[in-house]
Amino acid sequence: MQKPTSSILNVIMDGGDSVGGGGGDDHHRHLHHHHRPTFPFQLLGKHDPDDNHQQQPSPSSSSSLFSLHQHQQLSQSQPQSQSQKSQPQTTQKELLQTQEESAVVAAKKPPLKRASTKDRHTKVDGRGRRIRMPALCAARVFQLTRELGHKSDGETIEWLLQQAEPSVIAATGTGTIPANFTSLNISLRSSGSSMSLPSHFRSAASTFSPNNIFSPAMLQQQQQQQRGGGVGFHHPHLQGRAPTSSLFPGIDNFTPTTSFLNFHNPTKQEGDQDSEELNSEKKRRIQTTSDLHQQQQQHQHDQIGGYTLQSSNSGSTATAAAAQQIPGNFWMVAAAAAAGGGGGNNNQTGGLMTASIGTGGGGGEPVWTFPSINTAAAALYRSGVSGVPSGAVSSGLHFMNFAAPMAFLTGQQQLATTSNHEINEDSNNNEGGRSDGGGDHHNTQRHHHHQQQHHHNILSGLNQYGRQVSGDSQASGSLGGGDEEDQQD
């Protein structure tokens, strides 16, 4: 760029010289070259004020300078225009590049992290363990959740497990508590488990109904009873007979009786005593079987619903046969005869009943009680007849006072008539040898009539045939009196 500029300046300088002629001009030009050796650079620098005063440019030089300046502006404007044309293209490319880069950065940007990185899901049997069930089963669970008003389906399934806990225990014997439940950090909100949980677990919120005997306390009590030597059974738990078949074999075949429920709820020691007495009773029963067979031919024997009635014609107390039932039958044995010897008679009936207690001079009053049972049914009943000494009790039968009304089976009339016949029979045997005149006969008749009324009052409280029994007893009394008159004649 300097070479063209210098040539143009030289041309301009030559033109200036040709325009201004004369010797003075040459001398002035000589001086000018002497003072300004580098004329082209003078145009670019500043002019001194002395030079401006000394030399004034001509119009031709000013026009040449203007053309030079215009040429420089044109040469500078061309690359500027080219740069301005290329600038929009570069800006568009830069915008596209920035957009692409922003899209790539947005794609590579990681998602926002949670506040806590802890896994809130509990791992049960591995991380990928899930439950798959049929669609119908799932629909039923959802419907049950809506009907019960539960917050989640898991709560409904938990409720179903609670309801099925007895069946699960009966089928598996262990329940639904997993083997690794100690390692699981779970809180059983309302679990119906029958197993004891660690202290850091919450206790079961729901309890079983009283009819369900599979509660933890009941199972523990049953285990202690089994270790102690036997399983104690009490009648309040009869409501749960169906689920107890596995724990108590044979309980379905057991039929509780009134005597069992009222009189047999003893303690453990009393139960042991009763078992020993029953064993001794069985031995005595075997020994007296042959004797009973012979005595049955001589005595009237009527057995109604397990209650044995027997007369005392032989003059001694006969042992009553035990019915094959649960212990607790009522033993009714005739009193001792009046023709006793010097010593007292202690009569026992298989260890269950305490018979007559007597001192010197014959048999005493019969005492009826139950061993080791403190109930109202053990009240004593002593037969005392006015006009008859204590050593000569001629009563045929003695009944106990019962705490609860006892319903006889079929044949109540037969029981009443049989007892009355036995009373008359016993009185005839005892009083037949001692009747000397009509006065004794009337006294004996009055005594038997009074005793019959006494027994009729007891029977009327036990059954609904009191009136019929009373009529039959009066008839039997009249028959007994006729027989006695025949014997006296």
UniProtKB/Swiss-Prot annotation:
Give me the stretches of Basic residues compositional bias. 444-457
Tell me any Pfam family this protein matches: TCP
Q: Which stretches does UniProt call biased (Low complexity)? A: 54-101
User: Where does it live in the cell?
Assistant: Nucleus
Please give the organism.
Arabidopsis thaliana (Mouse-ear cress)
User: What name does the UniProt record give this protein?
Assistant: Transcription factor TCP14
User: From which lineage does this chain's organism come?
Assistant: Eukaryota, Viridiplantae, Streptophyta, Embryophyta, Tracheophyta
Region annotated Disordered sits at: 1-125, 257-314, 422-489
Select a single GO molecular function from the record's annotations and give it. Answer: DNA-binding transcription factor activity
